[in-house]
Regions:
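Secretory-pathway lumenal glyco-enzymes, predominantly type II signal-anchor Golgi glycosyltransferases
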Residues: 1-351
């Protein structure tokens, strides 16, 4: 009986050992899988073309001589645009020096109003002598019929009242964020010719206008033509976990790392970089993440993004306010109001 007991226990131990060994092998195989990838030293993300040559043909000559066909959309139909796109509404013949493009969504009416009443007020910037225009960028509804008409009707009324919405004819969705980036940059390049700087920012961020302007003032003329900045990720790894929101298969991107890129929540860039990106995005294979795609194009152009310590991807503490440029995490209206009040900028941003 005792011998049978020992044999039974031994059998049980062997089963447990084999099970653990199997789990260990699977785990090691998975770790090897997610760590694989080609070094960026061999980076040739399609298309393998000279973006500077294409840029020269498009912006420096009267006729586009490029024989290379873009692989991405070059333009999007505009459903709504402000009467004064990149002019000051109260001074139609005066162009802004800084244009802020707020990436919003159709139903985010409250977020847009919160921004208009706070850091989106042009007086926040005019107080420091900088003419600014803030525009909200939207796609269209995925619904059809009466649902589309109701939502679009509200957006139409909003634009009639405020005149600060740019709406493009692609479905508003997470998978189309790269289209929103392309459309926004094309609009900026074509309509905002006098602007020196652009900001791309999500509508759940709070911005600190004085600190943003201080950052802009420190950009040298030498650095200006290649200046782009934000919360830069220096060694970002592609996510290889299936079913993850950020999953990218090797077939789409075979490299072990992404090039450095500024996180999409807040990006500050010069007009020349916006022009370069608007061209480069047409000839670069897209991934589902707009900030990663920006990094791909910058890498092809040989441009290194600048990290800004004042751009926060999480909510701030009091100790960070002095150098804060923008902060993420303020979708809730009451939270937005309390966060804005904490910055103490109401006096310079009032009408």
């Amino acid at each position: 009986m005792y011998r049978r007991y020992l044999l039974k226990n031994r059998y049980f131990d062997i089963v447990i050992f084999l099970l653990l060994l199997f789990i260990f092998v699977i785990l090691i195989s998975y770790l090897v899988y997610i760590s694989q990838g080609i070094s960026l030293n061999y980076f040739e993300h399609p298309l393998d073309v000279d973006l500077y040559m294409i840029y020269e043909n498009e912006f420096k000559t009267a006729v586009n001589k490029s024989l290379i066909k873009p692989i991405n959309p070059t333009s999007f139909h505009t459903i709504l645009s402000p009467k004064y796109s990149c002019e000051l509404p109260d001074q139609p013949n005066v162009s802004p020096e800084l244009v802020v493009f707020v990436k919003s969504a159709l139903m985010h009416f409250e977020s847009r109003n919160s921004i208009r009443k706070s850091w989106g007020n042009p007086n926040c910037f005019l107080h420091f002598g900088v003419r600014t225009r803030t525009l909200f960028v939207l796609g269209r509804s995925e619904f059809t019929g009466w649902e589309y008409s109701d939502i679009q009707g509200l957006v139409n009324e909003e634009n009639s009242k405020y005149g600060d919405i740019v709406q493009f004819d692609f479905v508003e969705s997470y998978h189309n964020v790269t289209y929103k980036l392309i459309a926004t940059l094309n609009f900026a390049v074509n309509e905002c010719s006098s602007a020196r700087f652009l900001v791309l920012i999500d509508d759940d961020f709070i911005m600190h206008p004085p600190n943003l302007l201080q950052t802009i003032s420190e950009v040298t003329e030498t650095h200006y033509p290649t200046y782009i900045a934000g919360d830069v990720l220096r060694v970002p790894r592609p996510v290889r976990i299936p079913f993850s929101k950020w999953f990218v298969p090797y077939s789409d991107y075979p490299y072990s790392l992404y090039p450095p890129f500024p996180s999409g929540g807040t990006i500050l860039l010069s007009k020349p970089v916006a022009q370069l990106l608007s061209v480069g995005l047409r000839y670069t294979k897209l991934l589902p993440f707009e900030d990663v795609v920006i990094g791909l194009v910058l890498y092809k152009l040989g441009i290194s993004p600048v990290h800004l310590d004042g751009v926060f991807s999480v909510r701030f503490s009091n100790g960070h306010i002095d150098n804060l440029i923008s902060i993420h995490g303020f979708r809730d209206h009451s939270l937005f109001r309390s966060g804005w009040n904490e910055l103490g900028l109401q006096n310079i941003c009032k009408d």
